[in-house]
Regions:
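Nucleotide and nucleotide-moiety/phosphate-recognizing core
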Residues: 14-21, 30, 37-86, 90-95
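Phosphate-binding/catalytic loops
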Residues: 114-176
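Helix-loop-strand module that forms the ligand-binding subsite of alpha/beta enzymes
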Residues: 79-128
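Conserved active-site and cofactor/substrate-binding residues in soluble primary-metabolism enzymes
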Residues: 33, 37, 58, 83, ...
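Secondary-structure boundary/capping motif
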Residues: 30-31, 140
Length: 176
């Protein structure tokens, strides 16, 4: 589900850089749905035209084409790192291999980090940041646990900081 109604200025299509905020997870498994719930919360915000929100659900491989077409990817997901429920993790995709022993992202049909790595084989891997939240429960439930639900505002803050940083770098690069 693409939740961005904005279109870039047609005169700036070549210079516009696409930022994809991709929330993944299964809303039927309580905290596993944190990524999707964050995207729904962000859909109410007024975001820059370069930003696209996407509910990736549990799509796995079908996300590859979308990922290779973006310049900046911010992935929001449930991440099991062994810390206290509600702990927020933030790491770059380049750091993911060294984190793989400590972190497990989601329980989808395929690990989303594997999909991002596979995107390199079919095109390019965008600059990627993963923002994850330690789950309290991934049992069958349509509700997030209180510990995880309370973290959505902070996750959104972190996402917006990433967007601002990327757009500032883009402006500086364009000045050169």
């Amino acid at each position: 589900m693409n939740t961005n109604n904005k279109k870039p200025d047609e005169n700036n299509i070549n210079s516009a850089q696409k930022i994809l905020i991709l929330g993944v997870g299964n809303e039927l498994l309580s905290d596993e749905g944190i990524g999707v719930r964050t995207i729904k919360a962000m859909s109410k915000l007024d975001l820059p035209p370069e930003v696209e929100l996407m509910d990736g659900g549990t799509d796995g491989f079908s996300l590859i084409n979308i990922i290779v077409e973006t310049d900046r990817l911010i992935l929001v997901d449930c991440v099991k790192g062994g810390s206290k429920p509600g702990t927020i993790y933030k790491f770059n995709i380049e750091d993911a291999p060294s984190c793989s022993d400590k972190f497990k992202t989601s329980v989808h049909q395929i690990n989303i980090l594997e999909v991002i790595n596979l995107s390199e084989l079919v095109g390019k891997t965008p600059e990627t940041t993963v923002i994850g939240v330690e789950p309290n429960s991934i049992s069958t439930s349509l509700e997030l646990t209180d510990e995880v639900k309370a973290k959505i505002p902070r996750v959104i803050e972190l996402i917006l900081e990433e967007v601002d940083e990327f757009l500032k770098k883009k402006i500086e690069t364009d000045k050169v």
